[in-house]
Amino acid sequence: MSCYNPCLPCQPCGPTPLANSCNEPCVRQCQSSNVVIEPSSVVVILPGPILSSFPQNTVVGSSTSAAVGSILSCEGVPINSGCFDLSCITSRYCGSRCQPC
């Protein structure tokens, strides 16, 4: 690439300075050039599933799960009574009282 510098050196006006400096703007002009930038490969790591648990008296994958399910209740209302919804459990953790069926 060929460049030229149109800035002329400053002429000292007085004693010779210790360093060459001038207050005139110095512009450097170069020919147009093409630059190709290739991005490097990016590795993105996505988080795995977030597992959360709530303290409940349930047994999963056991032959006794049917028996345990019959004694589970929320504020005295059996979970398997046919009129149970999740608002009972969630309201229990939020501090409000469950409504009976």
From Swiss-Prot:
<dbReference type="InterPro" id="IPR003461">
    <property type="entry name" value="Keratin"/>
</dbReference>
<comment type="similarity">
    <text>Belongs to the avian keratin family.</text>
</comment>
<dbReference type="Pfam" id="PF02422">
    <property type="entry name" value="Keratin"/>
</dbReference>
<keyword id="KW-0007">Acetylation</keyword>
<dbReference type="GO" id="GO:0005882">
    <property type="term" value="C:intermediate filament"/>
</dbReference>
<protein>
    <recommendedName>
        <fullName>Feather keratin Cos2-3</fullName>
    </recommendedName>
</protein>
<comment type="subunit">
    <text>The avian keratins (F-ker, S-ker, C-ker and B-ker) are a complex mixture of very similar polypeptides.</text>
</comment>
<feature type="modified residue" description="N-acetylserine">
    <location>
        <position position="2"/>
    </location>
</feature>
<keyword id="KW-0416">Keratin</keyword>
<dbReference type="GO" id="GO:0005200">
    <property type="term" value="F:structural constituent of cytoskeleton"/>
</dbReference>
